Amino acid sequence: WFGNNNPNWLWHYHVPLRYLARNPQLAVGATRRNTFSSNRCFPISAKMERPNNPQSYGRVTSANSATPYRGGLFGESFARSVFISEPVHNLVHREVLKPEGVSFKSHRAKGEEKNEFLASTDNWFRPVQIKTGPDGALYIADMYRLIIEHPEWIPAAMQSRVDLRAGHDKGRIWRIVPKGAKLRKIPRLDKLPTQQLVWALDHPNGW
């Protein structure tokens, strides 16, 4: 499976922990690997005033929700894409997987070498989760907050000038589709006989 953390776009866990748990005496090395080659990102939003680590602008600092695309709606060129939300920089990043042994390496998509799959000029755009929908579209949960950092990282003097809770009662969900795409009808799986449910396992949409 795939995962990440704040400064790392994408990890691949190539040894499921359930297998290692069978032998608690076994000394095991790394069970995951970094697949990406660069932690650069390309935001288009205005750089906001922050006292901590100004050099981190343009570097991934809040990667989350590593989501392999399994919808089929975006076409064959997206077949091995993994989407990653980056709320601090107001963007969604894409890595393309390339098999390497029992794991993968990944790289930026062609045409996205110096830009992102999705980036916003809105500093309130805070994508925090991505899912593939039954219609093949990408659905993005947008936290919609002015301040995304933990308050402990913001000096008291600055805290007094901003509303740390601004947007706490708001949020947005975005549906992302290719231009001109025709969305699939969503079948009622609960109405299908068993045979058709089995056939549905071969559908390009993994949902």
Listing of model-derived features with the role each one plays in the protein:
Residues W1-V198, D202, W207:
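Beta-propeller domains with acidic blade repeats across secreted/periplasmic ectodomains
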